[in-house]
Amino acid sequence: RSLDVARGKITVTAPDAAGLFYGLQSLGQLAERCGRRIPAVVIEDAPRFGYRGFMLDVSRHFRDKEFVKRQLDLLARYKFNRFHWHLTDGAGWRIEIKKYPVLTDIAAWRPYPDWEGWNFGGKRYCRRDDPAADGGYYTQDEIREVVEYARALHIEVIPEIEMPGHSEEVLAVFPELSCSGKPYLNSDFCIGNE
């Protein structure tokens, strides 16, 4: 992979589309630094690591789709190729599941905007129409849009769905699935309660 800047000519060579994309990222960084007059330079490089990843935990701290896309833009700029999207955990369920709308009606919303309030405040979840509701979730179409956006940037999205541990948000809305049959306890899914 190389970027060759000569008088009146810029050449980017790479074995594949991702390599060309990364070469253009390098060119953009040079242009940002040097303005319209990029000095003659030859850059030959390749990634040191095949897996160059970043994890965003939206379960604990929800961020909207546009924020996620801005993060992807930054990852692409620095040639990251994996985006680990932590979508569910005890702190919130962030994916629309049409068969189970109660997951996003309740488990996507907390009555506290900050982590400490949620973690130590007692009440864990609330309905989205609660005046104190803070949180959110991604519709299936928004998830598809983010995945396609990432693909265009040569970034693979790795969704993380915490199961069966770290699933307090699921057990809050489906307590019958826990071994105790009660929500808000440190309990995992009970294999016998399907």
Predicted region positions:
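Aromatic/hydrophobic pocket-lining residues that form π-stacking "cages" and hydrophobic walls in ligand
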Residues: 71, 146, 157
